[in-house]
Swiss-Prot record:
Source species, domain of life: Bacteria
Descriptive protein name: Tyrosine--tRNA ligase
Entries under Pfam families matching the protein: SYY_C-terminal, tRNA-synt_1b
Main location class: cytoplasm
Amino acid sequence: MKHKSEFLNFIQERGYLYQCTNIDRLDQLLSQDNYIIAYIGFDCTAPSLHIGSLIQIMMLRHLQKFGYKPIVLLGGGTTKIGDPSGKDKARSVLPIEDINQNILGIKKTLEKMISFDYGKTGAIIVNNADWLDNIKYIDFLRDIGTHFSVNRMLGFDSVKIRLDREQNLSFLEFNYMLLQAYDFVELNKKYGCRFQIGGSDQWGNIVNGIELSKKLNLPELFGLTTPLLLNAQGKKMGKTESGAVWLDGSMLNSYDYWQYFRNVDDQDVGRFLRLFTDLPIDEIKKLESLKDQETNEAKKVLATEVTKICHGCKEAELARSAAISAFENEDSSLLSGYTITKEQIANGIPLIDLLYDTGFEPSKGAAKRLIQGNGCKVNDNTINDVNYTINSESFKGQPFIKLSAGKKRHIKILVSEVRK
């Protein structure tokens, strides 16, 4: 479907557009008004966002690219309650101090990925605690709660799924959709914001905000959702077996971040190039046309471009160089490291223990099977002896050894007086 708005055409071609309220009216507004203010919200449940939020961050970048002003709403208030959307059970209530620290961490991450200058399209950060913390309960029930139908609220997926499964839904969580709806109204009053973007699980919350604005006789508001981020196996992205894929470099280094995207399924490469990079669509189509082993080149481009956006050009190039070094048996000094002590080396460390300690394998039994299957290498030499021990001879006067598990996981083992 062709739109008048270049922004809508762009996000549709790249795969961002999932659902939209009154898309014809939004198309008209975006094509006629060059100064639209839009917002995307993030809850503050961790000290960093992970790649599950990457689509929304890219949408912020694209809003700026097309001349619109984005608002980043940090849920300092709503995080105190917890969004029930897509959750099987209630989140633990975080202490206020933790939420405030998380806000600082998320701000630091976002400042590397979108522009917060004072220009026309410069993003602004707001915290909904600034207005939610001051709400008087009786006034809120009378002025806002009266516009919500419990019958209708029970039909939204975030509520219905929990109730159908006979899973507990607290009154605290039930209030979340009222507060998010109120956020949209508040942002319209304060900043003239008329457009909200969120993940597909936020559809009900977005619609509630639009309906509330109508009942309060405000200008027409619009909402758009992006698709749920799933990989080729249908699994929700954002976490791996070894933990979340964080966007903060202090929680996940640029090399591991690069490697995550280098190792995505072949079927995901084209889609991720469209969603997570700034490459022109013609260049992406050329990369999408690569087949078989050539697909690995497209994966390297994907990994490098995504890492540039999150960690900067220098870190992306260092990560790419380290990966090439590891795969081509060259100097692997740029790889992430794991430190052991001289005392451990003197006593000797069973290779099985080291594979487990570094997190390469979830158990010593799995480590044993990896070795038996010729999947483990020390300094690029395959080790198939399950009793193999890492000792001073393994280092041969070098400051580190390279430990490899399979073809895609590599780490350097360093020696220090004390473990870091």
